Structures are given as structure tokens and as C-alpha cells.
């Protein structure tokens, strides 16, 4: 196990200010505690939330800030009380690295709703050290917030599942939408949206992609396996599709009207919000009243659900569509992500980027 009290440093790529530009940054890892594992990072996905974080879009960022919360790595050290993992295991780390363990949500195994949850970056751990994310050589994480990657699953493919994948799996699981034969809509075809199509199809759903243009029609239907494609500005087609969907997963990360999409839902249908939007959304109340429809939200998923989701994706052969880049390309990747110029998730080859050279 090595000396658990020896202070270690690691190298990551951090933003220093709201410009969001990342550059190399050396910092101290916290000590490996009794229930901690040290993870050598292999791959880390790039999520739209990383953009919000490094650019301080929500007014809560503290710098220097190492982003990255779709982390796949190899266990290189374990604390004496670790029972779930051993050195050499391939594991994943998502957006959370801590919670209080005592509140209602924690006792219900939905720790993502704990008021004292600890984010994997831009937060402070229980020992007072700042948390830093997966665009780095290594991390130290409590074993509760680490999951084993199923044997045979490619690590670069697993990375986006730890945020994009669980973000769509959790609401489908919680709201009772796992059974086959349902009709679902995916609003927005980015990193989360493309996983929504794949996971919903694997559950046996009829899936309609809803987008603002025809640009992604061929991709959605021929490559991702969607059953239908709606352009939201095509009023005739939108009218034809009214009252047809059991649910819509809304992944759009910018302000947009809700009423056109509420009209697509059946009675008791759910519009499930996923995008992080810092401006108010508007709708008129009869749009929900007259169909007993719901506007709700969901936030990533629990550790238990994440394990279930990984097993589900392995069993069903669900993979993510990715573009692998090295760390020295990360600022360009972020610029492209901001312009939606990626099909559909950037994954950083951290181990291949040789950060210590």
C-alpha cells in the first residue's frame, strides 16, 4: 500500500480565471485515508458542466480549478479499510466525491441530493483541501464514490457514461420509464442527448430526437438508431406529433421555450430538465394542467444507479461516440464544445498525454 501519510504532488491542467484557459498546474494530493483509493487517471471526458465551471458561469468558481468529472483510471494505492477495490482495478469517478452519510437522501442511497455533497472539483474536502478533477495524473477518492468499470469495457468508452450516461439513466430508472414499448423524446443531440438515444433504445423505447435544425437528422436516424426526428420550428410536424410521447429528456443547456415540447407529451407525460440554465424558463400553466403533465428535473445519479448503469451498458453493448484528444488540445476542445462542434463527447487521453514531461 505504500506510506499513507507521505504528502504527494500531482500535475493537472487548471483554469486560473474566468477566461477558462487551462494550463499545467502542480498541486498537493490529500493523504490517502483509511477508506480512500488513489487513482492514476487514464481517460477523462469533457462535459458542458466543465465549461460552466472554468468560466465561472454560475458565479461559484474558485481558482486554480482543475475540471473533469468523467474519470476512468487505475487503482494504484488503497487505504487499510478499503474493501471494494484492489491495486490494478480499473475504476470510475464521477461528479461527487463525498456526502454527509447521515441525511435523508444519503440514507436512501441518493447521495447526489445531499445538501453537504462534495463536488469532485471546485469544492473543499472534509480535511480542508480543495478538490480537483480528472484532468490530472491522479486523484485520491473515498471508495464509496468510486465504481468498478466492468471487465471488457474500454476505459475511453466508459468515461462519458460516468456523467452523460448516468444523467439519462437515472431519471428513466426513477420515473418508471425502463420498461420496453414506451415513446420517448430526446431534446438536444449533444453529449448527454446522444447517450439518451442509445440508452432509451437499449431499453426498447421508440425514440424521437427533437432539434432546432435538420443538421443532425442523418446522424440521429442512421448512426444513433433514433426512430424519428423532429425539427422544433416545423410547426406542421410538431402538431402531428402532439400528445405522442411518454417523456422528453431535455438536455439543452441554454434558455428556451418549454411550451412547444409540453405539447408533445401524452397525459401524465414528463418533461425532464437536464441542462444547467441560469435564466428563468417560462410556460403557461394550462400547458401542464390540461394534460396532468409534469416539468421535473434530475441530477446525475446515485452511486448504486451508476453501478447498475455500467452493468446495463455492458450487457446491452451501449457505447459512447467519442473523439479522443490529448491534454495539449484541451483549450481547443473547449472552444469547439462551446460551438457544439463535437460528435458527441471529447475524451482526454490523460495517460497518453505524459503530463510530467
Curated annotation (Swiss-Prot):
Cofactor note: Binds 2 Zn(2+) ions per subunit.
Encoding gene per record: CAD14
Keywords, sorted A to Z: Lignin biosynthesis, Metal-binding, NADP, Oxidoreductase, Zinc
Cofactor: Zn(2+)
Post-translational modification: The N-terminus is blocked.
Organism encoding this protein: Nicotiana tabacum
Gene Ontology terms, MF aspect: cinnamyl-alcohol dehydrogenase activity; coniferyl-alcohol dehydrogenase activity; zinc ion binding
Pathway in which this enzyme or protein is active: Aromatic compound metabolism; phenylpropanoid biosynthesis
SUPFAM superfamilies assigned to the protein according to its UniProt record, in alphabetical order: GroES-like (SSF50129), NAD(P)-binding Rossmann-fold domains (SSF51735)
Residues the entry annotates as binding NADP(+): 49, 167, 188-193, 211-216, 251, 275, 298-300
GO biological process, any: alkaloid metabolic process
Pfam families hit by this protein: ADH_N, ADH_zinc_N
Its EC number(s): 1.1.1.195
Name by which UniProt lists this protein: Probable cinnamyl alcohol dehydrogenase 1
Amino acid at each position: 500500500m505504500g506510506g499513507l501519510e507521505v504528502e504527494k504532488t500531482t500535475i493537472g491542467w487548471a483554469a486560473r480565471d474566468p477566461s477558462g484557459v487551462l494550463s499545467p498546474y502542480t498541486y498537493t494530493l490529500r493523504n490517502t485515508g483509511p477508506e480512500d483509493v488513489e487513482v492514476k487517471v487514464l481517460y477523462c471526458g469533457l462535459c458542458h458542466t466543465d465549461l460552466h465551471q472554468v468560466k465561472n458561469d454560475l458565479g461559484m468558481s474558485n481558482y486554480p480549478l482543475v475540471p473533469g468529472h468523467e474519470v476512468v483510471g487505475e487503482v494504484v494505492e488503497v487505504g487499510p479499510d478499503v474493501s471494494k477495490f484492489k491495486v490494478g482495478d480499473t475504476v470510475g469517478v464521477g461528479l461527487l466525491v463525498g456526502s454527509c452519510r447521515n441525511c435523508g437522501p444519503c440514507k436512501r442511497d441518493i447521495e447526489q441530493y445531499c445538501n453537504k455533497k462534495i463536488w469532485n472539483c471546485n469544492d473543499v474536502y472534509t480535511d480542508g483541501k480543495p478538490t480537483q478533477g480528472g484532468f490530472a495524473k491522479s486523484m485520491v477518492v473515498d471508495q464509496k464514490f468510486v465504481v468498478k468499470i466492468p471487465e471488457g469495457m474500454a476505459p475511453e468508452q466508459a468515461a462519458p457514461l460516468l456523467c452523460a450516461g448516468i444523467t439519462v439513466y437515472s431519471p428513466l430508472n426513477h420515473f418508471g420509464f425502463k420498461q420496453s414499448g414506451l415513446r420517448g423524446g430526446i431534446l438536444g443531440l449533444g453529449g448527454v442527448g446522444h447517450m439518451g438515444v442509445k440508452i432509451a433504445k437499449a431499453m426498447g423505447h421508440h425514440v424521437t430526437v427533437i432539434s432546432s435544425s435538420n443538421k443532425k437528422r442523418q446522424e440521429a436516424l442512421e448512426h444513433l438508431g433514433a426512430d424519428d426526428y423532429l425539427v422544433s420550428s416545423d410547426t406542421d410536424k410538431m402538431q402531428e406529433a402532439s400528445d405522442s410521447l411518454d417523456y422528453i429528456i431535455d438536455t439543452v443547456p441554454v434558455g428556451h421555450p418549454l411550451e412547444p415540447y409540453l405539447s408533445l407529451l401524452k397525459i401524465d407525460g414528463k418533461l425532464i430538465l437536464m441542462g444547467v440554465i441560469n435564466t428563468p424558463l417560462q410556460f403557461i400553466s394550462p400547458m401542464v394542467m390540461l394534460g396532468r403533465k409534469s416539468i421535473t428535473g434530475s441530477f446525475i445519479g446515485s452511486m448504486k444507479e451508476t453501478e447498475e448503469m455500467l452493468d446495463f451498458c455492458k450487457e446491452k453493448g451501449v457505447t459512447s461516440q467519442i473523439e479522443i484528444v490529448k491534454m495539449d488540445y484541451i483549450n481547443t476542445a473547449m472552444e469547439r464544445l462551446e460551438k457544439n462542434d463535437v460528435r458527441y463527447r471529447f475524451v482526454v487521453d490523460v495517460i497518453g498525454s505524459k503530463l510530467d514531461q
